[in-house]
Amino acid sequence: MDDDIAALVVDNGSGMCKAGFAGDDAPRAVFPSIVGRPRHQGVMVGMGQKDSYVGDEAQSKRGILTLKYPIEHGIVTNWDDMEKIWHHTFYNELRVAPEEHPVLLTEAPLNPKANREKMTQIMFETFNTPAMYVAIQAVLSLYASGRTTGIVMDSGDGVTHTVPIYEGYALPHAILRLDLAGRDLTDYLMKILTERGYSFTTTAEREIVRDIKEKLCYVALDFEQEMATAASSSSLEKSYELPDGQVITIGNERFRCPEALFQPSFLGMESCGIHETTFNSIMKCDVDIRKDLYANTVLSGGTTIYPGIADRMQKEITALAPSTMKIKIIAPPERKYSVWIGGSILASLSTFQQMWISKQEYDESGPSIVHRKCF
């Protein structure tokens, strides 16, 4: 496909927005889903200060801004800011005119219907796209792994969900959703670092903690044993240099933080961990297809890239499943972007071209057409 008519694929995550052209093997633009507004009054005239900043620019000026994420738990909570992010995506990052390209958007399963209707409306009415489609994130991850059957455990910044898919069909009755993901882990790390005597409170400092989390955290294979090791020696301690040059030391926090994925009670949540959620999702499926799901458990999303997470999932699910069951956890190296990659594959298939919602269909039926045309 040519860039001039290629479809645009935009994976709007709660934490990062991934965007690019269908047929490419990686997104061209990856930037934080942040809109920042100045905290202070501008006093220098003629500096061209803006009333809002998006993405990396907001991130780099975070010291003077209040940062807001318009997508929380996979659901858009602020449409004005969301429009700014889309505008930034098309005009500044991809440098395309959205009225010339079909646009594929993604969303979390079990999202409110109004959410996808509003997405559809903005695409056609604000950006005048010729055609668009909304795809379920986990389904795209499975496409990207080259499978048509499997269960996807997709965990990003805002939401985690397990989606069993059989022969290309998602099984909606067995989809489970857990509102515990990367952002909750960042907040939890802020909390446990405070207990160590380091104070992180502002929206800008949260971004520093997110960086600590991404660079130093890992999942322990055996949590209790790891805690004992950490208590008896300093072998697990690592140091991190803050932007102001101060160096902090972090020990058992490195694995206590992501442990909350397996023990949500750490965050005061009553829900099951990601291993049990995956198991429960499989158990909601027909008994005949469970074997195929156990053998094709695919991890996807940025919160699944902690070192050690695949081995731990293997261990936990093996303990829950029947003893003779073959269990395989697939953790593709590109899983941070597998939703986007799956979207790129889908939007460039010749068989997909009749699936788009066209501007004409939208004008005839209104936003509710999205429920009829997009699973």
From Swiss-Prot:
Cell compartment(s), UniProt: Cytoplasm, Cytoskeleton; Nucleus
Catalytic function, reaction form: ATP + H2O = ADP + phosphate + H(+)
GO cellular component: actin cytoskeleton; cytoskeleton; dense body; focal adhesion; nucleus; plasma membrane; protein-containing complex
In-chain residues carrying the UniProt-annotated modification N6-methyllysine: 84
Entry annotated with the keyword Nucleus: yes
Primary location class: cytoplasm
One Pfam match: Actin
Keywords on record: Acetylation, ATP-binding, Cytoplasm, Cytoskeleton, Hydrolase, Methylation, Nucleotide-binding, Nucleus, Oxidation, Ubl conjugation
Extra facts: In vertebrates 3 main groups of actin isoforms, alpha, beta and gamma have been identified. The alpha actins are found in muscle tissues and are a major constituent of the contractile apparatus. The beta and gamma actins coexist in most cell types as components of the cytoskeleton and as mediators of internal cell motility.
Identification of the protein by name: Actin, cytoplasmic 1
Organism: Sigmodon hispidus (Hispid cotton rat)
Lineage, uppermost ranks: Eukaryota, Metazoa, Chordata, Craniata, Vertebrata
